[in-house]
Structure formats: structure tokens, C-alpha cells
Amino acid sequence: MKIVIDAMGGDHAPFVTVEGAVEAVKNYDIHIILTGNQPLIENELVKYDYPKERIEVIHCSEQITNEDKPVISIRRKKDSSMVVGLKLVKEKKADAIISAGNSGALLAGGLLVLGRIKGIDRPALAPVYPTAKGISVLVDAGANAECKPRNLLEFGIMGSIYAEKVLEIKNPKVCTVNIGIEEEKGTELVKEAYQLCKEGPFNFQGNVEAREIPNGYADVIVCDGFTGNVILKLTEGLASSIFSLLKEEFLKNTFTKIGALLLKPGLKSFKKKLDYTEYGGAPLLGVKGVLIKAHGSSDGKAIKNAVGQAIKFMDNKVLEHISEGVSSLGDDEFE
């Protein structure tokens, strides 16, 4: 199994991408291909002890930055670490790609280079969402700001398969995000999607309100990418604010400091549950290849976990299951 890591993608590349690659080959029986600036990558690799025959470096003369325009950069920067990596997957020279680089460019590259699975109109970004009951998956988290009702049906199919096959959630509950649980509430998009999802090949449980999402009411949270991205960013910001406020309160006096020491194990466990590095990255579901988008500020641990995520994705044949799930509806649903 060969996995490409875009060594130049992310806020701390190539330091953390190389670190993650090294940890990955130590923990998994795989071959890693690092794409990017070869001298910089090799300068990092010499710092580690690892099975050298299992990490390959492919030099790329270009790099896509966060300032680059997504579609233009994919089309013009043919020798960038991201595009070269995507082409390796497209040409079956690699089985998956992981990148912490420019999100828009990676999503565009997924569509332009890898292409869509037959029957999928809109691929979707599907990050893990930590809840009080464990984890859920949020589909879509930003790939599609505007959607049609059938797109939400697609998201339900893909999210349900991913939740069951990779996250190991048995018979996952799928819900559409709405301002109320009643079937007649919401925008036309959500109301029409509700009717489609009722007949979908998954365990549809109706609408979920935003306040119930953190409680784990739904295993698969379905919404358009605009709504999903707002939910994701709000949750990230809220979690950060809560920890900052707790720290401020715990440092007020001797008694609160003692309390903090007593609560430290529980708080550490809670913080770990909310830590995105534990989950690797977010797959772009619906493209003809395994593509994992890692967080821009990922560390080596997150990159290593993204590799593990990609392995599980392939071992459980998620792409094949998505293709089968969509085809069961009939082609006329997606014309």
C-alpha cells in the first residue's frame, strides 16, 4: 500500500509532514511517498531513524500556498507537491493522498484531477465531530456552500457508509440539520432533502437542531457546506474559549489551583477528546480516490493518524461501498 503525503502542505511543513511520515512507517506496514522540495525534505529525514526503503521522495519545483487561488493554482502549478500527489493517485501509482495544504485547492484538485464517483454530483468534506456520546461525522463541512436537495441525499449515503466502515458506528443515525425537528420546518432545501432522505438507503432519523449536535443525537450530521463550516468553526472556537475561561478561573487563588489539580486527569481526557490530531483529517467523500484533508496546523501526530485513517478507508473498501450505495438509487436520481 502506497500513500502520498504532500510534504509542503500545512502551516508547519515540511517539518511535521516528514515527522508524520516517519511515525507512519514505524506504525503501519506501508510505503510513503513525500512530494515536495527534495533538499528540504531530505534535510528533515536525516534527523530520524526509520526504515529508509519505505519512504520515497519525489521532487517538485512548485508549491501551492494558502494565498493561491484554488482552481487556477491546480491548473497552472502542474509541478506542485499537491498536484503531483493527486496525479500519482489518479494514475494508480499511489493508493491515497494526505495534504494539510490549501483547502480550496485540494478540494478543486480532488474534482479536477481525481474526478467524481459515478452518480455523485457533489463530493463532500466529512470531518469527525466529537460529541458527548463519542464521535459523529459532519457532511458537508465546507466543500459546497450551495446545495440541491439531492446533494444532501448523497451526503447521507456517503456519511453513513463512512461512519459504519471507518468510524465503526453500527447502523448510524442520519439527521439533517434544521431549526426544528418538525418535518415541515426549515428552508425549501432542507424540507425537500428530508423527503428524499426518508426514502434513502440509510437509517434516517429526521431533523436535528444545532443544540443537539454536541449531545450525539445524530451519528451522521447532514447539511450544506456553508452551514457545516459554520457549525465546525463555531465548535472549534467555543472549545478554545471554554478552556481559556477554565484556565483563567483555576488560576484565581490557592483553592481554585488545588481544584484544578484534582480535576486535571478529567480535563486532560476531555481535551484529548476534542483534539483534532486524534482523528487525523477529513476525507473528501465522492471522488475517485482516497483523499484526506488534514488540518492546516496539523502536527506530526495528526499526519500519522491521517495515514491510519486512509489505511482504514482502503481496507474497508469505502469507495466501492459508496459507488454501490449510489447505484442502488438508480441513475435517474442523479441525472
From Swiss-Prot:
SUPFAM superfamilies: Isocitrate/Isopropylmalate dehydrogenase-like (SSF53659)
Gene3D superfamilies recorded: Isopropylmalate Dehydrogenase (3.40.718.10)
Location(s) in or outside the cell: Cytoplasm
Segment forming the signal sequence: none
Recorded metabolic or biological pathway in which this protein acts: Lipid metabolism; phospholipid metabolism
Record-level GO cellular component terms: cytoplasm
InterPro entries, sorted: FA_synthesis, Phospholipid_synth_PlsX-like
A GO MF term: phosphate:acyl-[acyl carrier protein] acyltransferase activity
The family this protein is said to belong to: Belongs to the PlsX family.
Function recorded in the entry: Catalyzes the reversible formation of acyl-phosphate (acyl-PO(4)) from acyl-[acyl-carrier-protein] (acyl-ACP). This enzyme utilizes acyl-ACP as fatty acyl donor, but not acyl-CoA.
Listed name of the protein: Phosphate acyltransferase
Species of provenance: Alkaliphilus oremlandii (strain OhILAs)
